């Protein structure tokens, strides 16, 4: 059986980001590969030195994606030693809009921007304050009074935070005559 080795979740200093690893290994063979962090989050929000890298690996049959994984493991790597690990703490800004901040989760709207690929984007900061994985989703979303679902979902590992964007494509906004965004209403669930 050929196995696929992948990273399901990656964190740097408690900030969830995208660690990319997808390596197939044929029966009886070995492979060396690297995990790439393809995420501007680490630079855009000054995460600092990588003092605590959390990785959740999953190994599964390449030819049967519906089969249960043959291995799932999570590890932490402390490049400077575990005693030097630093957890990221985001400082609030005057432009923040706190949507929710309770014992379970925190969601903060940081602002908006236009992205050439994703379209109109609401930038958010989210924290999972629990010891279980949370799925953040949006419901009943409207732009300028027109229903416009961004089809948003973000799975956030226990005790981590992340920066993300909730986006609407140009075509979605054009269909709803909402090229100029004046108001957005939505329910965010975790």
Label each residue range with its predicted role:
Residues 10, 25, 55-57, 136, ...:
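Fold-core signature of tandem repeat domains
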Residues 1-2, 125-131:
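Asparagine-centered strand-capping/turn motif at beta-strand->loop junctions
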Residues 84-116:
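Low-complexity, acidic Ser/Thr/Pro/Gly-rich terminal tails and inter-domain linkers that flank the onset
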Residues 117-123:
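Short, solvent-exposed loop/turn segments enriched in Ser/Thr/Gly
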Residues 12, 102, 143-144:
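Structural motif
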Residues 9-10, 37, 126, 140-141, ...:
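Hydrophobic beta-strand positions in extracellular immunoglobulin-like domains
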Residues 68-89, 190:
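Short beta-strand elements
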Residues 15-71, 146-189:
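Short, solvent-exposed, Trp/other aromatic-anchored flexible loops in extracytoplasmic proteins
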